[in-house]
Amino acid sequence: YAVDESGTDDDALAAFRYEGIDKPLTRINAVATGGKAPCNIFQTKNLIYTANYTGGSITEFRLADDGSIKKANKVMTFSLTGKAPDKTRQQSAHLHCVTADHYEWRAFACDLGNDCIYSLKPNATCDGLEVDSTLYVAAGSGPRHLTFDDEGRYAYLITELSGEVMGFSHH
């Protein structure tokens, strides 16, 4: 899977078939993200998500058995909630990354514009995600990417604006 950031309303998530090292990738299909500037992909067994930087959204798609992408199932849009210190870079929500913990019990999304990480959990019908809580980090830090250690006990955040690596315990 790859994002296709054309800079128009046609920004998309594309599916490709891989048939071996000596064969070219075959494009299966592409589906509009409903969000601008998709920049990150996270996949579970039958769902795939894009983090869309411009406009601050996450798009959720269902996957077909053949690996193709079905029409966007849900777009979660986030708003600027406060006054971020960097008026140029933090004028709106900017989702950079969506990922999950070691067990895929929760997803996490990094928002550069709001200086926070959203914790997302399955909704009541288990057919999508909803925000469970929000962890705010230092104002002006600009969260970019989050990853977990191999055992899922610790999370590490890279910030874009302050250039830091932050560590968190995860239970």
Q: What residue spans do the PLM features occupy?
A:
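Beta-propeller fold detector
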Residues: 24-32, 69-82, 129-136
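Structural signal for beta-propeller blades
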Residues: 9-13, 56-59, 115-117, 163-165
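A generic, well-ordered mixed alpha/beta core segment in the N-terminal half of proteins
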Residues: 27-75
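Loop-centered beta-sheet repeat module
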Residues: 106-163
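Blade-loop segments of beta-propeller domains
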Residues: 1-46
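Beta-rich, blade/repeat-based domains predominating
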Residues: 33-47, 79-105, 137-154
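Conserved beta-strand positions in repeat-built beta-propeller and related beta-rich domains
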Residues: 2-7, 50-53, 101, 109-112, ...
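Short loop/turn segments immediately following beta-strands, especially the blade-tip
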Residues: 16-23, 61-70, 120-128, 168-171
